[in-house]
Amino acid sequence: RLFGPVYAKDSEKKAIPYYNKQTNSPEPILTAKEVAEKVVADLEEARILLANDPVKTEGTLMSGSQDGTSNFMRYRALRLNYYAVEALLARVNLYMGNKTEAFEYATDVIKTADQGIFPFVDKSLVIGSPADPDRIFSSEVLFALTNTSRSKIHKNFYDPSRLPNYVFRMDDNLMSN
């Protein structure tokens, strides 16, 4: 969406290359429609591959294994899972103007709240404890991306103890004419 035309206005304009394999060679720049179709195809394949995702039967499994087995299939809310793929399919289909398909995928994801898989956040958790409020509505997180170097990145770019020239900040000159 950021690097191409407004899809609803001209989906046939060139947008970005699409890589479905690791390569050192540049791929051709595709139209927004071609990119969207490839995204949908990849997500549909992911949906099929995740058909037996434990999130569907056991929920998010947000704790470590108690029997010493691998945690690879646990913490499903923090990994790309079946419902996260469906949410992305809803989003892409809505972007493409396929409202019926978008509605079907979104409805399937919303139904998980009734099943206790991704329940809507409890108001008391948001405002109940000033010391530890749930400001990200963690029960509603469908998947997350993690950068293990986040604290280092923050220190390098945003730590106020660094010299002003080495901290990302808004330049006052940009705020005036």
Residue positions per predicted region:
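Structured, solvent-exposed acidic/aromatic patches
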Residues: 1-177
